[in-house]
């Protein structure tokens, strides 16, 4: 197991297991079913447009701790900035090692990705989103923007940011959605 190998390689460092994923949201609305009185049809204003923003999540399933970033795109450069920000936030370095589990998106595996000191990347098998705990966060993050109309992408980002702050204050909810029974308990 990779966690055990990291603990062996860095015996004086604390080792934590985290995972990361990105989620695209935009002005194309997320429509969900809702309850309504018998005989009444619920209406949702829709104006399909294709402008996007990306929600990056870094989650530690063991504790439910989560860090969110709302960024304009996904590519190796932006991913490197997200990694750098995350490493600073959690204090990764010589005394704290983070094993970060992620998918094999092109911007995760490219040669131009700059991985900060203290961050170690572990890639899941290709085409296996069911193995990624972060995937379970998207229905929670979508809750604040579902069935809503946004005129501008900035409005969506503001509501999304508020939802992410609210979710940061609910570690048990995050933990219950991301802590798989087979997820290593050691870190």
Give the predicted meaning of each segment:
Residues 52, 102-104, 122-144, 153-156:
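RNase H-like two-metal-ion nuclease catalytic core shared by retroviral integrases
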Residues 12, 61, 95, 116-118:
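Short, well-ordered coil/turn elements that cap or connect secondary structure elements
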Residues 2-4, 9, 80-96, 123-128, ...:
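A structural preference for long, well-packed, hydrophobic secondary-structure segments
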Residues 83, 94-108, 132:
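Acidic/histidine-rich, metal-coordinating catalytic segments
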Residues 13-17, 134-187:
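C-terminal anion-handling pockets and recognition modules
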Residues 1-84, 180-186:
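Extended, low-complexity cationic-aromatic segments
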Residues 30-43, 112-126:
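A short alpha/beta connector and helix-capping loop motif
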Residues 26-28, 108-110, 131-133:
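Short catalytic/ligand-binding loop motif for oxyanion handling, primarily in non-cytosolic enzymes
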């Amino acid at each position: 197991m990779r966690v055990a190998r990291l603990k062996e390689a860095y015996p004086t460092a604390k080792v934590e297991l985290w995972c990361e994923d990105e989620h695209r949201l935009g002005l194309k609305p997320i429509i969900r079913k809702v309850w309504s009185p018998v005989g009444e049809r619920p209406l949702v204003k829709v104006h399909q447009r294709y402008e996007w923003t990306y929600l990056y999540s870094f989650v530690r399933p063991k504790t439910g701790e989560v860090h969110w970033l709302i960024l304009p795109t996904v590519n190796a450069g932006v991913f490197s900035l997200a990694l750098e920000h995350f490493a600073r936030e959690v204090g990764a370095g010589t005394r704290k090692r983070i094993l970060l589990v992620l998918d094999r998106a092109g911007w995760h595996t490219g040669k131009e990705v700059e991985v900060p000191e203290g961050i170690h990347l572990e890639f899941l098998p290709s085409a296996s989103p069911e193995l990624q705990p972060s995937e379970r966060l998207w229905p929670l993050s979508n809750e604040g923007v579902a069935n809503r109309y946004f005129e501008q992408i900035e409005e969506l980002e503001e509501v999304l940011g508020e939802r992410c702050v609210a979710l940061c204050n609910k570690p048990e909810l995050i933990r219950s959605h991301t802590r798989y029974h087979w997820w290593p308990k050691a870190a």
